[in-house]
Amino acid sequence: MINMIWAMDENHLIGDGDRIPWHIKEDLVYYKNKTKGQVVLMGEATYYSLKGYYKTRPLPYGTIYVASINKELKLEDAIVINDIDSFLRDYKDELWVVGGATIYKLSLPYADRLYISFVKGEHKGDKYFPEIDFSKYNLTWQNETEEVRYTLYERV
């Protein structure tokens, strides 16, 4: 089961450099509750951004897969994968795709569930989520707060 989780504004903005363009505590809690201790897939830039945020503390995930084109890359606390298509096609267990933009784009064709936090308003940044063909998914859950509409889409 391949799950993708992200927050985006109404223009599909998801990032500003290596940062999230907003700080919404409830959304961070939601993300942590879904991904803590889970097997995750992320890109190399996202990995280094999170390592910078957590500093000497370990990342709050179970097994960490990092997608990279660098075949020489070795990471102490993660498994490096160089062929994301083969990895996603063959992966059979629960997996959470947690970013960034390129990894989301490459993972979307394989995703069974989309956990999307729609952040209200427009923000400034430079990283966008690709277009989604929502006809391939059913909206099965949503909850709205003042700042965010949380949704779950499941593949038809």
Tell where the protein language model's regions lie, with residue ranges.
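Enzymes that bind and transform nitrogen-containing heteroaromatic metabolites
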Residues: 1-156
